[in-house]
A protein has these predicted regions:
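Conserved structural core of kinase catalytic domains
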Residues: 375-421
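ATP-binding glycine-rich loop module of kinase domains
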Residues: 325-363
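Conserved SAM-binding loop of SAM-dependent methyltransferases across substrates and taxa
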Residues: 88-99
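Catalytic activation segment of kinase domains across protein kinase-like and atypical kinase folds
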Residues: 212-213, 435-487
Length: 707
């Protein structure tokens, strides 16, 4: 319902007092489709719509995983939140659920309508539509949190002027309480993903941010030092850096300077939902190196900067790419110099899943009480609104069993690996008969402090697997996560001892897929699709750098020069720029004085070549001239005076020879011979099929091609 300069969609108020009656920022048809979708589909069905659409736009705007970037913030119902650049409402719902009131500002009416329709049940959301600089003077100055999620980089669009980012920040600062917070989530200009071959998020081209945006554009991201420089020059003295991983858009884990990632943790790096990317190196291995060198904070893909007083939360992990009733969040807090762990349900439906942790802890504590394995202590508590959360002992100065096993492999310490693995096997089998098994008793889920081993994860239990199956799963998971591990002789020895060959690995993979299906299955039968699978459905490529070299090698042509003694390797060279498209050759050959003939080898494998034309001395050769000077070592197919010749080369050394001395006198220095052709490379199977077809045609119709 619209009244004057306001409109109400459900409980959400849209304020058009400063709306210029025109949307200056709109994605057109994709936003029209989004608006129709949110008008008719309830939010609980968005996962299925995301799956059906298999598009970046629908995933980006409607995925509940976008909320993770603010889901950990210590916001409560006593607080007011300002969200600048609220867009289609990716995080508005999470803020509204946590805060007393949420004020949104966005330039686009259409995006604001999408936001309002999807959150129409929220009675604490007001959306101001229009330019921020027009709306800002009327906003209160006592917000507890001001959130700019993927917005600060557009400062020059919001403000303009010579120092737009400084001015933008100073204006925002006016609207925060003295003990309040500004929260900025932004890509790191030096993020590792950009070095590794991802396109810059805003410009969409390779290395644009690393090259400092030579083509310009509306957005500017910053390095850590660049952000700190702006904050300091604006007089900000209290700020804290957090590191969303893999990035802030679909964050699963939040690290901080007080809790940095450990070696081996950053392995989820294929996240190019929006565009094709290159794979220039193994990001996990480079992240591991950066962690060891103390440089992770400089190369994190994204930053979250929070100004104001430091919070207790130093780490947060979201396990919510799951069915609703299984979705949880794990926080690590630092209080009085000590750490503690808390696990929260992501929603009320997941409360029983948290409560089950206490039951599992009791079962495993009893089972392992006389073994060499301890069970991490847990206490079930309640939040102010009555939801359960688990408070769990934090183990200081620990290493995981996985880390210790990796160390043995790196040092080729077979005896050390065997000792650790044998102890693990004895633990897995301890008093196993007739009791629950910890399905996820894998190597990363056992912490080692000196000689004390502790089970730290007992979220998933089963009474359907034997200890042998638990052990096989753990070792197979360990190997599958890293090809180097899987190929190591020590790991191969233990896989063989357990009877795990290729067939058994396939069966284990099928069981793993079945478990993932269980985790994604809602209680009402609906199922969500994991982010990794959505990346495949959207269909953007991740192309290894090796393929570029393979394509480059395939697309090189070799030129031979004949000065009267025939073609020899000594008088040959490669042209790497002869291709003007994937299958089009435009070879410009500069001839030396005395050149009598030129041979062009278009490839180093069987192929089909259609010669589009040959130029000599600036003129295209006629058909009569081609008949006089052109020869190949292939079969010319369907050759007619009105048709350019197509040649089948059955050899791995195809060549096209042009005798210049048949056209005129031999070449003088610097004259150009140009050969244009289209090429199709043939695999061995394709060549065999063509040869069989030609032979059959020859038997039926006679000899219809000429050499």
């Amino acid at each position: 319902m619209q009244t004057g300069r306001t409109e109400k969609i459900g409980n959400v108020v849209l304020d058009y007092s400063h709306y210029p009656e025109q949307d200056f920022y709109c994605d057109g048809a994709s936003e029209d489709a989004l608006l129709e979708l949110v008008k008719t589909i309830p939010p609980r069905e968005y996962p299925q719509e995301i799956y059906k659409a298999a598009s970046w736009e629908v995933l980006y705007h409607l995925s509940d995983l976008r909320e993770n970037i603010v889901g950990w913030l210590p916001v409560d119902k006593s607080m007011k939140v300002l969200e600048i650049g609220s867009g289609c409402g990716a995080i508005t719902g999470s803020l509204a659920q946590k805060a007393g009131s949420v004020t949104c500002v966005d330039l686009s009416k259409k995006r604001s309508l999408i936001n309002a329709y999807r959150h129409q049940d929220c009675d604490n959301v007001t959306i101001h539509v229009g330019n921020f600089s027009d709306i800002e003077p009327d906003l209160p100055t006592d917000y507890d949190f001001v959130c700019l999620i993927g917005v600060f980089e557009y400062g020059q669009s919001y403000i303009g002027g010579k120092t737009p980012f400084h001015d933008f920040y100073r204006i925002i600062k006016k609207h925060v309480k003295s003990d309040g917070h500004i929260v900025i989530a932004i890509e790191n200009k030096l993020g590792l993903k950009y070095w590794a071959g991802c396109r810059e998020d805003h410009v969409g081209t390779f290395f644009s941010g690393l090259e400092d945006y030579p083509q310009g554009g509306a957005a500017r991201t910053f390095s850590r030092s660049g952000l700190e420089k702006i904050l300091k020059e604006c007089g900000e003295t209290e700020y804290h850096f957090y590191y969303p991983y893999p990035d802030y858009k679909f964050m699963t884990t939040l690290y901080s300077d007080r809790y940095l990632p450990k070696v081996g943790e950053l392995s989820n790096n294929l996240r190019n939902f929006d565009r094709d990317r290159m794979l220039l190196f193994d990001e996990k291995k480079v992240f591991d190196m950066l962690i060891r060198e103390g440089l992770f904070g400089q190369y994190s893909n994204s930053f979250l900067v929070m100004t104001g007083p430091m919070t207790d939360i130093v780490y947060s992990r979201f396990s919510n790419d799951r069915a609703e009733h299984l979705s949880i969040r794990t926080d690590i807090l630092e209080k009085g110099g000590k750490h503690l762990v808390r696990k929260y349900p992501s929603n009320p439906a997941a409360a029983p899943h948290i409560e089950a942790l206490a039951e599992n802890e009791s079962i495993f504590t009893e089972r392992f009480k006389d073994s060499t394995l301890s069970v991490n202590r847990l206490e079930l508590k309640r939040t102010a609104d009555g939801l359960p959360f688990a408070e769990i002992e934090y183990l200081e100065n620990n290493r995981t069993l996985e880390e210790l096993l990796d160390e043995c492999l790196q040092n080729n310490d077979e005896a050390g690996f065997d000792k650790l693995f044998d102890r693990y096997c004895k633990i897995a089998a301890w008093k196993a008969e007739g009791t629950k098994q910890d399905y996820d008793l894998t190597f990363p889920n056992i912490c080692v402090q000196s000689d004390i081993w502790t089970m730290i994860d007992y979220e998933w239990t089963t009474d359907k697997l034997t200890p042998q199956q638990i052990i096989s799963r753990a070792l197979n998971c360990y190997g599958q996560e890293d090809p180097v591990r899987m190929e190591h002789p020590i790991v191969k020895k233990h896989l063989e001892a357990l009877g795990i060959g290729k067939e058994q690995m396939r069966e284990l993979s099928e069981k793993e897929l079945a478990f993932q299906h269980f985790v994604l299955q809602e209680k009402d039968g609906r199922s969500r699709t994991a982010l990794g699978q959505l990346r495949h459905l959207i269909g953007n490529r991740a192309v290894p750098y090796q393929e570029f070299f393979a394509r480059a090698d395939r697309k090189k042509v070799q030129v031979f020069e004949d000065f009267g003694a025939g073609y020899t390797p000594e008088h040959s060279y490669y042209q790497y720029d002869a291709y003007e498209a994937d299958d089009l050759i435009n070879a410009r050959i500069i001839c030396k004085a005395g050149t009598k003939a030129i041979r062009l080898d278009p490839a180093e494998l069987p192929c089909l070549v259609q010669i589009h034309g040959i130029e000599w001395r600036g003129k295209a050769l006629t058909r009569a001239q081609l008949d006089q000077c052109l020869s190949t070592n292939g079969q010319v197919l369907a050759d007619t005076p009105s048709h350019v010749p197509t040649v089948l080369f059955e050899t791995g050394d195809p060549n096209i020879s042009v005798r210049l001395d048949c056209l005129d006198n031999e070449a003088t220095d610097g004259e150009a011979l140009i050969i244009r052709a289209q090429i199709a490379w043939l695999s061995a199977e394709m060549l065999q099929d063509i040869q069989a077809r030609l032979a059959a045609a020859a038997r039926r119709k006679g000899f219809w091609f000429q050499r």
